[in-house]
Amino acid sequence: MAQPDSSSLAEVLDRVLDKGVVVDVWARISLVGIEILTVEARVVAASVDTFLHYAEEIAKIEQAELTAGAEAPEPAPEA
């Protein structure tokens, strides 16, 4: 059995930390229509630099949405 190439493993790890990986899980277990267990999880693997970059971009998007919502005129009341 051949050993995995350690340089390729290092390249994969470098790419995962550079780009980041998100695993989003949602599962519900029910028995006879009765919910027994619900699992919600989000796992993020990335370098701190990558995380901070994307967190900054997400904050900009959220701020733009809040600003757009505040500037939207209120609907006229119905008569």
Curated annotation (Swiss-Prot):
Residues 9-19 are annotated as: Alpha helix 1. It is found in: Gas vesicle shell. Residues 32-34 are annotated as: Beta turn. Residues 23-31 are annotated as: Beta-strand 1. It comes from the Archaea. Pfam families: Gas_vesicle. Residues 35-43 are annotated as: Beta-strand 2. GO terms for molecular function: structural molecule activity. Induction: Transcription is activated by c-GvpE. Poorly expressed at mid-log phase. In 'wild-type' cells (probably NRC-1/NRL) gas vesicles are seen at all stages of growth; in standing cultures, cells float. In this study gvpA2 (c-vac) was not detectably transcribed, presumably most to all gas vesicles are derived from the p-vac locus. If the p-vac locus is deleted gvpA2 is transcribed in late log phase and rises in stationary phase; gas vesicles appear during early stationary phase, but fewer vesicles are detected. Gas vesicles are hollow, gas filled proteinaceous nanostructures found in several microbial planktonic microorganisms. They allow positioning of halobacteria at the optimal depth for growth in the poorly aerated shallow brine pools of their habitat. GvpA forms the gas vesicle shell. This protein can replace the p-gvpA gene in the p-vac locus and increases the critical collapse pressure (CCP) of hybrid gas vesicles from 0.66 MPa to 0.90 MPa. In stationary phase gas vesicles about 30 times more GvpA1 is found than GvpA2. Expression of 2 c-vac DNA fragments containing 2 divergently transcribed regions (gvpE-gvpF-gvpG-gvpH-gvpI-gvpJ-gvpK-gvpL-gvpM and gvpA-gvpC-gvpN-gvpO) allows H.volcanii to produce gas vesicles. All site-directed mutagenesis is tested in H.volcanii. Belongs to the gas vesicle GvpA family. PANTHER family: GAS VESICLE PROTEIN A1 (PTHR35344:SF4), GAS VESICLE STRUCTURAL PROTEIN 2-RELATED (PTHR35344). HAMAP family: Gas_vesicle_A. This is Gas vesicle protein A2. The gene is gvpA2.
